[in-house]
């Protein structure tokens, strides 16, 4: 059975392409999702994408992934630095999770340097624009394949 990956996009990512293009680029969220779908097919996995500006919706999606998905790819956006709830949900479901960011959060304002998600993720990819998502999906699928073969 092919692996199923839950892809979560946090607050304000619905505005990609128009929001602060100097930081986040001009690629839209729809375009990122299309690229992820194409890569998922190439890698032999399925994905389900969800964007929400609401923390509880994201928590519900993470909890709902239990028994349905083998991994989570998440850009928590601003919730990276504030959400113990997302961190606890990821820890609770114990699914391999990769955290991604379009910008390099460690080169930005000091308050963006801390991630509540990173300690419960298998890895973090930041600073490669929309490619961060593709790199994250590749890394997650590779991790799942290695785990299945061990």
From Swiss-Prot:
InterPro entries: DHquinase_II, DHquinase_II_CS, DHquinase_II_sf. Pathway: Metabolic intermediate biosynthesis; chorismate biosynthesis; chorismate from D-erythrose 4-phosphate and phosphoenolpyruvate: step 3/7. Pfam families: DHquinase_II. CDD domains: DHQase_II (cd00466). Gene3D superfamilies: Dehydroquinase, class II. GO terms for biological process: amino acid biosynthetic process; aromatic amino acid family biosynthetic process; chorismate biosynthetic process; quinate catabolic process. Its EC number is 4.2.1.10. Keywords: Amino-acid biosynthesis, Aromatic amino acid biosynthesis, Lyase. One of its GO terms (molecular function) is 3-dehydroquinate dehydratase activity. Catalyzes a trans-dehydration via an enolate intermediate. Belongs to the type-II 3-dehydroquinase family. This is 3-dehydroquinate dehydratase. It comes from Thermosynechococcus vestitus (strain NIES-2133 / IAM M-273 / BP-1). The lineage of its organism: Bacteria, Bacillati, Cyanobacteriota, Cyanophyceae, Acaryochloridales.
């Amino acid at each position: 059975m092919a692996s199923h990956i839950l892809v979560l996009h946090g607050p304000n990512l619905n505005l990609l392409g128009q929001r602060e293009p100097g930081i986040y680029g001009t690629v839209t969220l729809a375009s990122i999702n299309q690229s992820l779908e194409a890569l998922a097919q190439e890698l032999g996995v399925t994905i389900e994408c969800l964007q929400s500006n609401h923390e509880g919706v994201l928590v519900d999606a993470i909890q709902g992934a239990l028994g349905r998905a083998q991994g989570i790819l998440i850009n928590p956006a601003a919730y990276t630095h504030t959400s113990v709830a997302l961190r606890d949900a990821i820890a609770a479901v114990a699914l391999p999770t990769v955290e991604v960011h379009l910008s390099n959060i460690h080169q930005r304002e000091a308050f963006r340097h801390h991630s509540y998600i990173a300690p419960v993720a298998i890895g973090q990819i930041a600073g490669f624009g929309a490619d961060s998502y593709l790199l994250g999906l590749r890394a997650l699928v590779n991790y799942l394949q290695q785990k299945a073969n061990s």
